[in-house]
Amino acid sequence: MSHSAIKSERIGNVLCITVDDGRANAFSTSLLVALSQELAEAEADSEIGSVVLAGNQKAFFAGFDLDVINSGDPKAITEMTTAGGAFIRQVYGASVPVVAASTGHAVAAGALLLCGCDYRVGVD
């Protein structure tokens, strides 16, 4: 599954995943599922030695999508938060090191993602 906000680039044995939704990189269900798939594919590739996860120039990640939360739709909210928890656990337990290139603010679930990564680098 691809997502328009995700750009993946392989540099040697490192997979660089950059997310830029043009705003604050809020976690939507579709973004989380696509990120999970990107990481799973990297883990399955024996030539990938590590993954770097970066945001845009404004934010690393801003947490869950407030539009979904404010919608009051319990199914959509549950799907999004479940996908978020699953992705953070996947990052934490990944078979390859995951480096967070924190390009800006990491808010709420975005901060939890930082904690799940093996290494965190603040990028100015």
Protein language model features and the residues they cover:
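Residues that form or flank phosphate/diphosphate-binding pockets in enzymes
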Residues: 26, 61, 109
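Glycine- (often His-adjacent) and acidic-residue-rich active-site loop
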Residues: 47, 54-90, 106
